[in-house]
Amino acid sequence: DRWAGSVKLSDQLFIIATGNRVEDKSGANRMCTKLGNRLRCLPFDEYLDDWIAWAKAHNICAVLIKFLQFQPKMLSDFDPTRKTNPTPRAWEAVSLVPSFTGRDGEKLFHALVAGDVGEGAAAAYCAFRKMYLNLPDFSELLARPEQYAVPEDLSIRWATDMKLVDL
């Protein structure tokens, strides 16, 4: 065919499109047979290691990368009954959410993240982020352990202990 309306398409032109599967109930429509016979449909899965390599090359927030390493199933957790789902594309959008200060800033940050990945994933990420940002400076801790003030927050204590075990 190689026509788009009245325009003849070059033999060197390739058109690449993406879409969702009908069975995912994500707003996709069944492709007509005529169109299906003119396309190659290639299913693919996303892999955390691939996404992390891409994310590092594209300056995605390091805390977000660490969160997804901690909770790998959160990279892509599609549920057709939810309005918003965590997907690789949605996590990229989360990385663009600016940080805000103060209690209202945390609420605003959470709301914006929830708008991208849904409430459950946002709650998990925001809790991880808050804990991670409160971890001690480990180079300082190792250089002067006697001056280290033990955190009162048990989750920060636990994360600090786990980090020290890994060193």
Where are the regions that the model predicts?
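C-terminal regulatory/interaction module of P-loop NTP-utilizing enzymes
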Residues: 1-167
